[in-house]
């Protein structure tokens, strides 16, 4: 009873801290569940696909970013964070397989193990936030709670994005700069205070004592220099956009103590020179490793010292050149300059985005009104964090391709500055200089603690949980179970049988998740000690958002080619599959009916992986067949549920229930098996298999 009373009477800070630990546990748990949601193809194709495929000699896709002729992705960090840990994991897996027949290498491991590494790295953001709060005497409980409950950490922090590493490195850099600023301000203040005392001292003994005290002050001018320069080099090679995030942080580090008697431009220039000098070892290491990996530099050339500038690869420069090509960036999507500010910021940070934009607008207004006395001091933590938010935001808005994940490094400074507003409201005191009736009404009804304080934390929770569920478990969530199912098909298929998979209106399928030994490299048989090359038996065709009529033409071409090989001398058997969102099932049926493919192509629905939402094929909000809405299973042999005329039925609960059922059933990824029949043309070419549906 006493423990219950103590638990109920604990302070708000303790409640926030205990809630944070719950969210931290959820972050770890989401790694092992695992999250089925597929946020963006770059999660796999910028690191995991290549590293896992190379290490385990699996079939994998090497995107244009890893092209040996002009590589734009550095291999050092993915190699250190994935390839080396995979070696230890493989050793443990082989031992457990030999001793207890446990198989730890498969689709699940290829997803979970890299995510576990990146999730552990994500906790460095929490540590840096806690450290800065302790250094500056700030409340860390609510800030940690905001960080831990953010969908950015729950989703992006547990995924293998280069943006997640960029966020962690920016957090470390901010932590080091903040510590250096505090130490410099403290030491400079004490030094100038002692110098004044020294000048006023009358006796020699007192001057000696003060001189000893001044010399005992700790060094501060070059604090954390090596660590900061190394982080900057690693950040730029990870993502060259780190230049935009790191530049204001390094600038504040260089300006520490400027304007005092102790720090002059000589110190400023010395810091710049030594910073560049300390960055050289990391710079040489990254360039050397990338040059070896992309085969621009060989050990033979290194031994013979036959070297030229062409032997070295500088991937950040290649990245910048590629992104300066407007046609290249346009292929990924062109966005207006206001997307980051008006869409991505509110999407990532919801109420805290509004708080930060409002606070920055207030700072700009006071600056242009020359109200300098109420502005934060330039060499303060508020100025540092504000610069870390809005300087990169401004320059990133000038780039025509804008995605929410590009702003992940803004998370740390934004939460540090504005997380307390989740409990205090947008403004605890009247923020305007003039007391105008309209401004007073605006403050009382929206900004004040009484008006906004009780609701902001609730809005924060609801929005972040909703976005975590959507991107973590619904968005493109059928791709992972599809890969696991195809992996099982290939493992159990008859010998000398080719498997062909056609996908449409879904994200690219990472080949390494299917767990197929590569046909492009030599494999080693440990029993016979012989090397062999495995013939290719899996083919994948990805057609993105291709219209269904054009998709059927592709299906006919692929099936025709397979039939030719099957009837040829090799008698090559095959299995042909089609994976499309369930929302397109009815459109697929209509396209088949109106094409001549219906006379010989038989589509058999094998499974529907739930849930799955492709924004490229959004479910129909109104069922196509109002008499009996049951998508995607309305295409039975008798076409039950179809209407010759789609009249609007009476508005009723039964009708709403059917419409809702239609919408829910469309939230899936349908897998069809296609075979060719030469029999009498059938009235229906899609049939439902006897197999049960698989809920992913």
UniProtKB/Swiss-Prot annotation:
The keyword Cell wall biogenesis/degradation does not apply. One of its GO terms (cellular component) is endoplasmic reticulum membrane. It comes from the Eukaryota. Keywords: Endoplasmic reticulum, Glycosyltransferase, GPI-anchor biosynthesis, Membrane, Transferase, Transmembrane, Transmembrane helix. It is a multi-pass membrane protein. It is found in: Endoplasmic reticulum membrane. Its EC number is 2.4.1.-. Pathway: Glycolipid biosynthesis; glycosylphosphatidylinositol-anchor biosynthesis. The keyword Endoplasmic reticulum applies. GO terms for biological process: GPI anchor biosynthetic process. Its main location: endoplasmic reticulum. The chain crosses the membrane at residues 100-120, 125-142, 149-169, 185-205, 227-247, 338-358. One of its GO terms (molecular function) is mannosyltransferase activity. Belongs to the glycosyltransferase 22 family. PIGZ subfamily. Mannosyltransferase involved in glycosylphosphatidylinositol-anchor biosynthesis. Transfers a fourth mannose to some trimannosyl-GPIs during GPI precursor assembly. This is GPI mannosyltransferase 4. The lineage of its organism: Eukaryota, Metazoa, Ecdysozoa, Arthropoda, Hexapoda.
